[in-house]
């Protein structure tokens, strides 16, 4: 595959597999207003605002998937999708009654709206695919250059970033990786150190120049509720740029294709330190934390939760190596929880405020232990009030089974004293950290 920056014209001929995986990884998250979806969920759940019927959403999703995988043009996308939506009644202006019983005239499907759906979703998908490709070669091409189209339609703020270079792991890319707004056409080019020297480019830095604040995204006309989201500005005194409201995020780090695909991709990365940096970035991302919170909220109102699965995070390389040394099998790296486990163990062990932040807790556990008798990993995290310890247990078979990339976890509440006693008796090995005992 040619190592070059991907835009829609190139992708029409050779779409990256990562972009296709990215779209197929998305779930359903139906919203009434676009600002309910916002940045974090853009990369985790497929949404078309006001598409409140599942058949409509499924139809749109199918055509967007085809646009990404087959590289069809916007005109063909509209020509194929429009009659399908018209048949479903999702077209033109209609009087719609929302969940609160309020009626108003809104525009559903239209050529202009389908063009927006096509542009936003294909560019975001290709951005995620390109991000995956560049992270996989970041040891060879560690410098990323922001590239704007620089024509009469380019936003002035986006043009100011044109040709600026940041390292791949700079904080800048967490919020300013394109697209940075509706119909943004910016992209990123990966460069080697030799190419940087050849072009005479200098590295810029985001640290100390990033300012994040809460801003209004919109107001629900039926309830008066104001939706707020994070907006991050880069301002180094010479260049100032703020993405459009709802776009201060990185579509690649938020989704990075499917998590399972990422795990398999990570083993191809040559540099061990780079692999760990990727894992830490993903584990600590606010996108993952928000996605988990949204999942909890949705399951709370559903009676059928048993088969739902949500990723909590990724096992670090050091922990995986420790398991391999003890079992002879390299463990699966993706830690997941399903609805059944949530209902039977997590609710009983964790208070709601602790459960909400479980991905963050697992990203920075107090300790990681190995249960020698049961061959289980134990992630030890503290409750917010500090009165107990929570043990996140991996499934019995931590070794890869049938090429599975995920490990199911369950949660139990234990005392620090009992863990300390088991460690002293040689029943548990301490792999990382230590168990704190309240005095």
UniProtKB/Swiss-Prot annotation:
Compartments where found: Virion; Host cytoplasm
Keywords from the named record: Host cytoplasm, Late protein, Viral capsid assembly, Viral release from host cell, Virion
Highest taxon of source: Viruses
Induction of the gene: Expressed in the late phase of the viral replicative cycle. Expression of late genes is activated by the viral late transcription activator C.
The keyword S-adenosyl-L-methionine is assigned to this record: no
Principal subcellular localization: virion
Pfam families reported in the protein's UniProt record: Phage_Mu_F
Gene Ontology cellular-component terms listed: host cell cytoplasm; virion component
Task of the protein: Involved in capsid assembly.
NCBIfam families on file: phageSPP1_gp7 (TIGR01641)
Protein name (database record): Putative capsid assembly protein F
Organism: Escherichia phage Mu (Bacteriophage Mu)
Protein's gene: F
